[in-house]
Amino acid sequence: MLRTCLAIGIAISQLAVPASQAEPRRLNNVATQLVGVGAVAGNAETVDFANPRDGWVFIRAGKPAGAEPRAVIDAAESALVWRAHPRNGALEAMVKLAAGPHQLRLEGARRLTVDVRAIPEIAYCYYPTKPHIASYGPYDWAYMEKYVLPDVNTIVTRSEVDPDQFAQWVREGRQWLSNASLPGLSSEMPPSPDEVYAYWAENPVVTKPGFGGLIVDEFIGASEGHYAAWAEAWGRLHDTPGFGGKTFYAWCGNMWDEPHSLEFAKKLSEKDDLFVWEQYLREGSDEQDARERIDRCKSQFAKWKQELPGVEQKMVLCLGYLSAPPESLNLNPSADYHVYLDMQFHALTTAPEFDGLYGVMEYMADYADEESLRYAQKLFRHYCIEGNTARFNNDPYLLPHLKNADFADGFDHWRAEPAAEGSVETRNMKGFSWLQGRYPKTKQGDTFCWMKRAGEKPNRVLQSLQQLTPGRTYSVKAISADPARLDAQKATPLNIEVAGAEMLPQFGFSFAYPSCYSHESGPYSSQNPAWFTFHRAVFRASAPAAELIINDNGDPGAETAFNFVEVQPFVEP
């Protein structure tokens, strides 16, 4: 049984109630308060609690005025390693414990508040990694310490981790998972069990200490022969000494939809291995469409529970926050992607279909907009740790600030100011949005504003932004390209200005990127990618309305095509 732990922090009110007297209280589908918030009466305190299932426990002890208190769970040889939350200094810890009674012993904790909760597995995927949009900055350990580590207990890695960082995370009681692919998945002929086993057996999860499990990507549609080979290799892996006591995670689709995949799923369940169910939900055209996509997720999960009773206790539901080029579920610039993420988290943690869910994950940091990555951590905290049932984000699903973001209706709601006759038009190109990175494939975004620079004077398009909240920060995003030289590896200059608002240039950038290797259209492929430029400008509203001005900024004769003009509330670091 793992008895180590990590700590993070959040402000807690001081309550004059002995911590050990509180009764467990279910907060939502994934969080249960085992010991209520209360002040420690003496210098030493013993807190008894019962973990309702094998899994993660969150311990919070407030912000100390002096030295950190010493905390030990059960008969552990070492004390918990606290982590002070970067925003408020409160001490928190997470530890993976078996179901049943436990005891927390605190020394030097007088007047500190104590709060103990059962929480889900909260996973971050992947570290180390770097974003495809380099302007976001590195997702390095310093970034993780500030924005990610306080709110997760599991990190998925697919590459070498700095030894000191690896050891620190293990000391804190949290968990590393090592990623591996699934041999034979892309081949028509099944692999041999020996081939599959040999590949998994050389993974660091077997050859190096400290990992909690192996997460294999991915169990989807395949033949009976494939599943027979994978099942045999999986069984042999569990018999391997280096894998003893570790967990096999199956990244998967609907494993109940074929007899052979369902049979393998039953074996995984009997062994208490875990499923990581992929639910990468694209934005809907409106809120009703978005809710229907979440409802389909609910109905599919009901099928899981029908075929594998109790599977919710072995399920990590993997959402997708692919929200930036070159592959993005944020494909509708008229919708607020952060509102949609909040809708998904709210459903997982409050809808009865997901009651008892073991864990939650977002896939994956490489493709995540940096702002959305930070925002998702706030959702993990709000729902999975604090156990809230009220929505975190009450903004409307459809963004009210700008209309006709993809120029699908020509210049409706826009005012075009061409520098010369015929130098500004709306055009379309089949596959344009797919090459941009919108996923899954859609015709939305195949229309765009086209400009051709004429002499020294720029072309301009303008739109009045509406329903802004004075003092609130917003981003303007756009994606541009040179339609005459789409394969040219260069940035397309585009100037974005918001008149009547305070521009915040420290958050703005333009970054050229190639189309995703799997997004092929016409002559463009992984070997001959199309090139686009992702633009972001950020402003603080001074009034309920402002004027958005976009102009081309290239050399005379240069062509620029752009769309995906999204104006959305911005989450500042």
Language model: regions and residue ranges:
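Glycan-processing catalytic domains of CAZymes
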Residues: 98-109, 114-395
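Beta-strand acidic-aromatic groove motif in beta-rich domains, primarily in extracellular
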Residues: 66-71, 416-418, 459-461, 484-500
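Extra-cytoplasmic beta-strand recognition segments
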Residues: 55-63, 407, 459-492, 535-537, ...
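Extracellular carbohydrate recognition and processing domains
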Residues: 36-41, 76-96, 501-545, 555
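Short carbohydrate-recognition loop motifs
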Residues: 29-38, 431-457
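Short beta-strand-plus-loop segments that form exposed binding edges in beta-rich domains
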Residues: 105-110, 549-558
